[in-house]
Design a protein with these regions (language model features):
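Formylglycine-dependent sulfatase
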Residues: 1-253
């Protein structure tokens, strides 16, 4: 059973998703079939508290298990600010790496102001073997972002929507890991930008919400649905690779 092994671990963190935005938590409008399936087959938490109501400190709290202020971050971090997750803090990936896990991070970092600069620690300094990230939000929007950095190297413009880009980076890393080191467990931190603004969504999904009172609502609904589809891609890859039953999959916001 899962308890007898060192399971793989996938943690998916959304940005600004409300607890009432998923069908499995009572939403009657937004289609989230993959997350509904995950909730139906697992444990659905009804009492959960973030370490902070804003972005950067909540991420620091998740990664360290500490009150964010104690780890050096007390508010969201604007670009260029001399604030960052303190070097030397113990994190989930750093401790799992010590335990023999391979580690990957893909998506929104937002734990420092001077992203991909040598005078502040970067994702790799906190235990991630491979990282593919932005400092803050996908820019100029979720569509065709151009601010990703892969393990210290700028990627440039990437076609597609951020959540699919992040999901496919994650899947590609997992596939390579399983092919080369199948006996080594892995930890994958998937930090979607969705549905934080600036929002953009596939038009075919936007058109699927004709009863929305305004286009902005339809864009948001479609954004959550598109994120759900990206979760489905990751879940499908775990099934295809035959490792789903030995993978602890956690979704939160």
């Amino acid at each position: 059973t899962l308890a007898d092994e060192r399971p793989n671990i996938v943690v998916v963190l959304c940005d600004d998703l409300g607890y009432g935005d998923l069908a499995c938590y009572g939403n009657k409008t937004i289609r989230t079939p993959n997350l509904d399936k995950l909730a139906a087959g697992g444990s659905r938490f009804t009492d959960f508290y973030s370490a902070s109501p804003v972005c950067s400190p909540s991420r620091v709290g998740l990664l360290t298990g500490r009150t964010p202020n104690r780890a050096g971050v007390y508010d969201w971090i604007p670009p260029g600010r001399a604030v960052h997750l303190r070097r030397g803090e113990f994190t989930i990936p750093s401790m799992l790496k010590r335990a023999g896990y391979a580690t990957c991070m893909a998506g929104k970092w937002h734990c420092n102001g001077k992203f991909n600069q040598p005078d502040q620690p970067q994702p790799g300094d906190f235990g991630f073997d491979h990282w593919f990230a932005t400092q803050n939000n996908a820019a100029p929007s979720h569509r065709d972002p151009r601010n990703f950095v892969r393990s210290g190297k700028e990627v440039g413009a990437v076609k597609g929507f951020s959540c699919q880009i992040v999901a496919r980076e994650t899947i590609g890393w997992i596939e390579r890991h399983v092919a080369s080191s199948a006996d080594t467990p892995f930890f994958s931190y998937v930090a979607f930008h969705e549905p934080h603004e600036p929002i953009d969504s596939p038009e075919e999904m936007v058109d699927g919400y004709p009863d929305a009172k305004k286009r902005g609502e339809a864009l948001y609904y479609a954004n959550v649905e598109n994120m759900d589809a990206a979760v489905g891609e990751i879940m499908g890859a775990l099934d295809r690779l035959g490792i789903a039953e030995n993978t602890l999959f956690i979704f939160t916001s």
